[in-house]
């Protein structure tokens, strides 16, 4: 009966406009009404679209500006002669505007920098994601990311004072401002990006794949190398591409330590030769060139070439990532493989096992015949020998060697960070005085302080934010 009375009351209230439970239409234009929410959503959508459109317009005008000022040099000299000319001497008589040596030097510096940073970066990322205890990780990871907060000019200053002097003394060369110095510095600068992105990619690998690998009897290193790392390959590839972008686009640090000689190293593997990059050329000459001159337009041509190289790297990265994802999805959807005759399986297994040895020998012999590059041949043969005996080493010993190399990677990164910070602190802190921080410079910068520079930097930062 009580339930019946409640139902009757509810029906009565629904039909009574004065009842609190009577459904009411929202007031038009009021806060929280559908019309107001729709207008707010529409306004936000238009605002975000305007922001995106503004960014696109800015980029378009930058590209148009570069192409407009670079066109005269392409018209006067020709694109082919500009790209393949061996001499860059804008102040000579007659002037020469060939950037082939600049392109080669930029690529060489980038390749050696990546050869340094990729193994150290991926090894350090594996340590942080898979091997480091929690307390160690909470200390080491922020320390590694601290490298990303060091300005490039500080890296360049350290390289100019410490690194070049070390190269000059240890390699007995007239100057330490070389290709090697620039690549080492760029490799260290690219490490934080590669480590952070790779570590995130490795850590995001599903836990189930690790547990499944362990359940099948795999060692920790076999799980990392054959299961976790392939699962995180797209993220690791993205990290490498970002590192390459940092190496290609860096200006100040490279400008300060490479010697800035627009020549191709002779022989090509002479890492102790001075070089000049595209970015270094822009940084050195743009501030002193006469506006509207041929030299001025040639520098804009250099900027366009640098832009094309960067764009090509990004497009290549997009293609590689797409292929990796496509291959990964195909591997997931493929449930079984068709097995052939036993002899074919044996031959395929044999080729799979020794293919690296065969490739190493063939490449080594080819390079020996063409370039007579004994060092590279020795490296290839050493790698081939390692792959040959790898199958005969127990998994536990392989794991010990691999973990030792990974530990060496993270210790090398921390050593580089420690050396840079220690040099800056030891040489800089004693000169930090109140007068130095609050006084303007005097005597043509030989005395006084840096207060105007601090204020100007803060203005730039606030304006950028």
Please place each PLM-identified region on the residue numbering.
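Transmembrane-helix boundary motif in ABC transporter permease subunits
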Residues: 36, 113-144, 317-326, 387-395, ...
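Generic hydrophobic transmembrane alpha-helix motif, especially the helices
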Residues: 145-183, 187
